[in-house]
């Protein structure tokens, strides 16, 4: 089992861009995926080829006064970005994900975040 503390994900609305009538991954998405890969590498995590279960906790961003920001990603919005970012860092392909448990936490932190637990399945 591996637990990763990741930065607050970008919105799926900013994940794709249209360029010359083609959909491409945005620079923001590429940068987020690179940050996730770097965090995984720093923690000695290598991609597994086995089926996995994910537990995802979305931590809301805090306002300056410490209250939770009203601008918060939908939980399903954050999952797509999270799954794509972990591909190649925690598992080889996102079709290996057989279970997903997701929850939005109530207590905000500065900048928000994402805590992901990756467990190999038998």
Descriptions of predicted regions:
Residues 1-122:
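Acidic, proline/glycine-enriched N-terminal capping motif
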């Amino acid at each position: 089992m591996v637990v990763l503390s990741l930065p607050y994900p970008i919105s799926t609305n900013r994940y794709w861009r249209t360029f010359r009538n083609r959909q491409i991954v945005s620079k923001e998405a590429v940068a987020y995926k690179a940050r996730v890969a770097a965090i995984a590498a720093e923690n000695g995590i290598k991609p597994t080829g086995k089926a996995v279960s994910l537990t995802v906790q979305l931590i809301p961003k805090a306002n300056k006064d410490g209250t939770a920001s009203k601008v918060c990603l939908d939980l399903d919005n954050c999952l797509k970005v999270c799954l794509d970012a972990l591909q190649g860092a925690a598992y080889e392909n996102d079709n290996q994900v057989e279970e997903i448990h997701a929850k939005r936490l109530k207590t905000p932190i500065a900048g928000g975040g994402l805590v992901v637990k990756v467990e190999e399945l038998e």
